[in-house]
Design a protein with these regions (language model features):
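Short capping/connector residues at structural and topological boundaries
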Residues: 6, 18, 27, 47-50, ...
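Compact soluble domain cores
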Residues: 24-51
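Glycine-rich, flexible loop/turn motifs
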Residues: 1, 18, 41, 48-51, ...
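A generic secondary-structure signal marking the coil-to-beta-strand transition
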Residues: 1, 32, 51, 61-63
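Enriched for short, Lys/Arg-rich terminal
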Residues: 53-56, 63-92
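Arg/Lys-rich, positively charged N-terminal/basic patches that mediate binding to nucleic acids
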Residues: 1-32
Length: 92
C-alpha cells in the first residue's frame, strides 16, 4: 500500500512529477520514497546510507531517512507502513 503523504508536494515527487522546490533532489528523493514503500519493517530501512533516525522533541514518534545533508524524509511507522510522509528541509 502506498504511504499516506503529509503534503501534496511530497506525493508529487513520489509519483515522479516535477516540483520546482525539490528539483535539485527529486531523483534521489523519489528513490528514497520507493525504498520507504518497499519496506515491511523499520529494520528494512536500517541501511547505512539511509541513516534512519528516531526523532526527538516536537517530532517525537517520527523517524527520518536522509536524502542529503539538508533534506530528510520524515514519517511515522504505524502497523508496518509509513504514514504522514513528508520531505523536510532539515535546516529550517
Amino acid at each position: 500500500m502506498p504511504p499516506r503523504y503529509a503534503n501534496k508536494e511530497t506525493e508529487l515527487v513520489a509519483r515522479g512529477v516535477h516540483v520546482k522546490k525539490f528539483s535539485a533532489i527529486a531523483e534521489r528523493a523519489e528513490r528514497r520514497l520507493d525504498q520507504l514503500v518497499a519496506a515491511t519493517s523499520l529494520a528494512d530501512l536500517g541501511l547505512p546510507g539511509l541513516r534512519l533516525e528516531a526523532l526527538k522533541g516536537d517530532r517525537q514518534g517520527q523517524y527520518s531517512v536522509r536524502i542529503n545533508r539538508q533534506y530528510r524524509i520524515c514519517f511515522e511507522w504505524v502497523d508496518g507502513e509509513a504514514v504522514n510522509v513528508e520531505i523536510v528541509d532539515y535546516h529550517n
